[in-house]
Design a protein with these regions (language model features):
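N-terminal export signals
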Residues: 2, 7-27
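Class I SAM-dependent methyltransferase Rossmann-like catalytic core
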Residues: 180-185, 189-210
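A short acidic, Gly/Pro-enriched loop at the edge of an enzyme's catalytic core
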Residues: 285-297
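A short glycine-rich, Lys/Arg-flanked "PGG" loop and its adjoining helix->strand segment in the class I
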Residues: 312-324
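C-terminal alpha-helical "lid/dimerization" subdomain adjacent to the S-adenosyl-L-methionine
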Residues: 329-395
């Protein structure tokens, strides 16, 4: 369903906040709309309706099946009987399942797959995951002309704009098939359409995008209260970008990513729901954006997808494009250097990390998880603050990702 921008502004809670707080002060007035991520008002929640999606019920049914299989696997693994079985298996190896162990994540996985139940469940999950990606990919390629024409209609349309750079030098680290998505984010023309339906088994709050709203609502603003320009770095298909615009409707909001296909779909969605944001294909190591341009730069679940040798370059670039007093809002897995960090060293915890690394193609995640990320922020000149609330992954995990704030000294 298309929602006209003027309709949204006339009826939504965001519009009420604009009218109340901004009055006639104009675009430069700070308007900060508070939204409950897990109880969004209908007029905002409806903006997250899937603009994309399948055109045919048989494709939808296949996706529902693989989603259901994964739900069964997850529920089965959590059953007390399965937990007791795994504990008995580890005890047969003279290992207390609750104890930390001195072995690598891969060694822990190789130990657990000696248990037939664990091995079968892990194999079924990986095969089902492949089918879950394959279904939308086949569906969109089967009707490629239709979907390409749909995006062509909005490529040059507003509100907002799309900036693609076919000559951009894509880092090798971004060419991996992240999350095991065939073709990856940069090599698959329908990456955005496929990602929306396949990521997190299609259950990543597609109805209300609670994670994106939680991510942006947790952001700390600059001390002087000025928020005119915001950048969502590694924006993917643009959920966080739109959520930043919902929170700060008067701000100029950018979404930047190296993946052109994701940005093309992000812009398509933004046009369809009438959101005025800018999506631009750039490399986070060297964006080409002006010094001190942004008041807030945010990244959500981005840095663990960046190669270790590139992380410092990206962090230096974030520091450069923030104005003095500007804020970097970081949401990702907890690492060393965080005051609440406790490394998981049980056999099951280590094996789970290995499965995520290999079966979910999280190529750079192990290195990120073992890094001192707050230390990296300090190394480029940020003052680091841990006081902001965590961001959630879903209504069932409302505080699952820590927030780390970097403040550029004035």
């Amino acid at each position: 369903m298309e929602i006209e921008r003027r309709t949204f502004l006339a009826t939504s809670a965001a519009a009420a906040a604009v009218a109340t707080q901004a009055g006639a002060a104009g675009r430069d007035a700070l308007v900060d709309v508070k939204i409950d991520p897990w109880n969004q008002p209908p007029e905002i929640a409806q903006l997250w309706s899937k603009v994309g999606g399948f055109r045919h019920q048989d494709d939808e049914s296949r996706q529902d099946f693989t989603r259901g299989v994964m739900s069964f696997i997850q529920r089965d693994a959590a059953r007390p009987e399965q937990q007791q079985h795994l504990a008995a298996f580890l005890k047969s190896k003279k290992i207390n399942p609750l104890d930390d162990v001195e072995m690598t994540d891969e060694e822990a996985f190789q130990l657990l797959v000696q248990d037939p139940a664990y091995a079968a469940r892990t194999r079924l999950a990986r095969t089902n995951f492949a089918l879950h990606w394959d279904n939308p990919r086949r569906a969109f390629h089967k009707e490629a002309d239709y979907y390409l024409s749909e995006m062509e209609k909005t490529d040059n349309a507003g509100p907002g704009r799309l900036e693609l750079n076919p000559d951009l030098d894509i880092p090798d680290s971004a060419r991996h098939e992240i999350h095991a998505m065939p073709g990856g984010y940069v090599g698959e023309p329908f990456a955005g359409w496929i990602y929306e339906l396949g990521h997190m088994y299609g259950t990543a709050d597609l109805k209300d995008r609670g994670r994106a709203v939680s991510y942006t609502q947790a952001a700390k603003g600059p001390a002087d209260g000025k928020v005119r320009r915001i950048l969502d770095l590694g924006c993917s298909m643009g959920d966080g970008t739109l959520a930043f615009k919902m929170r700060f409707p008067n701000a100029e909001v950018w979404g930047v990513d190296v993946a052109g296909p994701l940005l093309r779909y992000a812009h398509y969605r933004a046009v369809k729901v009438g959101m005025d944001v800018i999506y631009s294909q750039r490399n986070g190591e060297n964006t080409g954006l002006p010094d001190g341009y942004f008041d807030i730069v945010g990244s959500c679940i981005t840095f663990h997808e960046i190669a270790p040798d590139a992380q410092k370059r990206v962090m230096k670039e974030i520091h450069r494009i923030l104005r003095p007093g500007g804020v970097y809002h970081h949401v990702d897995f907890m690492t060393d250097g965080h005051p609440d960090y406790t490394p998981i060293k049980t056999v099951a915890g280590r094996a789970g990390r290995w499965v995520d690394h290999r079966h979910n193609v999280e190529t750079w995640s192990p290195a990120y998880r073992h890094s001192d990320f707050p230390g990296l922020m300090r190394a480029v000149g940020f003052d680091v603050d841990f006081s902001q609330p965590p961001a959630g992954n879903s209504v069932d995990r409302p505080r699952s990702f820590p927030t780390v704030t970097g403040i550029k000294r004035a």
